[in-house]
């Protein structure tokens, strides 16, 4: 038996001219149920054997409340503390006492119980009240994501004499995902308060090996403009975060990225170089034409051929990536990957004639790793590229 729930909603608004807002909601929930039937000859009919459910869960989300926090260590500590609150909130038997291994937790719902860790993780990193937030991840509602664009900045009276085009961009995208879950084969629906011998926790109906929360401002702010004399400028600042909660080894992998990009371009029209096919031609002619003027020696000079465009491009970017691995209850924060990366590139393109295009370029890249086991890397390259078109 298969079940699939899909939601894909989009709303586009234009509050005023050239200002567009796009809001989206997404959800994809899949459940596949499988069981075997067997007649054992006892006369009791068919027996239901090994019922199994597998599936996935994916929704658009909103975790912006904690994205800009500077102290990620205190946020993680809050996540660990919130587990005790969710342990007490879980539905339990009437005479339930304290957990034998974790006195601060309710019976059957210890600090490493899946039904305790996952809702505490979602509430903490979403900035929700742990006393009122949801207990079941599959009942979480999708949240809006958005994209904002304004393309009318150059039409303002103060700017229309300088700019020929301009836009401002802002966008937010976030996902909450369970890539795969499956039935716990040891779960007994007729004995829901049966505990595991090793941890004294109740068995969960399903096992969720991994929960992922991603979000990004792409960009947080982006600006593009072009002047009347063909100067182009772009600015982008983006923030990304990825949180992966692993329920197999009780580890949280947090990836944070920030990137700043600045670009500059200029198209210089009618540039004439003393080579190629755009220099003046001198010829001797007995009779000058209308577009030729004889000089003192009787030679005629043909008007200079119109030059081609010279395109200049400069790009500068700085990116900061850091990945931390944290293990629950071990007070361990280990940077495993990451680097600060500086990139600079510039290029000049010029079409000498209809057959030959010349390009000069220089690229610089500097990587400073965040872990001591790696070494800084610097690369630089430059050169001239000649492109020939055979006709």
Task: Tell where the protein language model's regions lie, with residue ranges.
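Exposed, low-structure sequence patches enriched in small/polar residues
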Residues: 1-391
């Amino acid at each position: 038996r298969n079940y699939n729930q899909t939601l894909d909603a989009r709303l586009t608004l234009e509050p005023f001219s050239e200002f567009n807002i796009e809001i989206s909601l997404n959800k994809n929930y899949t459940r596949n149920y499988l069981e075997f039937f067997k007649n054992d000859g006892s006369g009791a009919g068919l027996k239901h054997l090994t019922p199994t459910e597998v599936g996935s869960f994916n929704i658009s989300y909103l975790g912006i409340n904690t994205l800009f926090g500077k102290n990620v260590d205190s946020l993680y500590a809050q996540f660990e503390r919130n587990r005790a609150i969710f342990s007490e909130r879980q539905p339990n038997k009437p005479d339930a006492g304290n957990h034998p291994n974790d006195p601060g937790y309710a019976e059957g719902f210890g600090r490493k119980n899946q039904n305790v860790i996952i809702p505490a993780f979602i509430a903490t990193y979403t900035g929700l009240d742990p006393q009122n937030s949801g207990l079941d991840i599959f009942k979480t509602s999708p949240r809006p994501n958005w994209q904002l664009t304004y393309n009318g900045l150059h039409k303002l009276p103060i700017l229309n004499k300088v700019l020929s085009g301009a836009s401002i961009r802002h966008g937010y995208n976030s996902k909450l995902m369970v890539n795969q879950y499956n039935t716990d084969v040891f779960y007994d629906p007729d004995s829901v308060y049966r505990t595991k011998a090793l941890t004294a926790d109740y068995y969960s109906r399903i096992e969720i090996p991994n929960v992922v929360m991603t979000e990004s401002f792409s960009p947080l702010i982006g600006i593009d403009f072009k002047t009347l004399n063909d100067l182009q400028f772009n600015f982008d600042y983006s923030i990304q975060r990825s949180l992966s909660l692993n329920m197999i080894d009780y580890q949280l992998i947090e990836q944070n990225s920030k990137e700043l990009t600045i670009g500059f371009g200029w198209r210089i029209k009618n540039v004439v170089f003393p080579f190629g096919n755009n220099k003046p031609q001198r010829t001797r002619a007995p009779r000058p034409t209308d577009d030729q003027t004889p000089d003192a020696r009787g030679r005629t000079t043909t008007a200079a051929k119109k030059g081609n465009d010279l395109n200049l491009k400069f790009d500068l970017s700085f990116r900061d990536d850091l990945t931390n691995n944290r293990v629950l209850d071990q007070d361990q924060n280990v940077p495993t990957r990451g680097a600060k990366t500086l990139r600079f590139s510039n290029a000049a393109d010029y079409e000498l004639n209809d057959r030959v295009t010349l390009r000069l370029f220089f690229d610089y890249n500097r990587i400073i790793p965040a872990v001591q086991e790696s070494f800084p890397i610097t690369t630089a390259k430059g050169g001239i590229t000649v492109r020939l078109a055979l006709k």
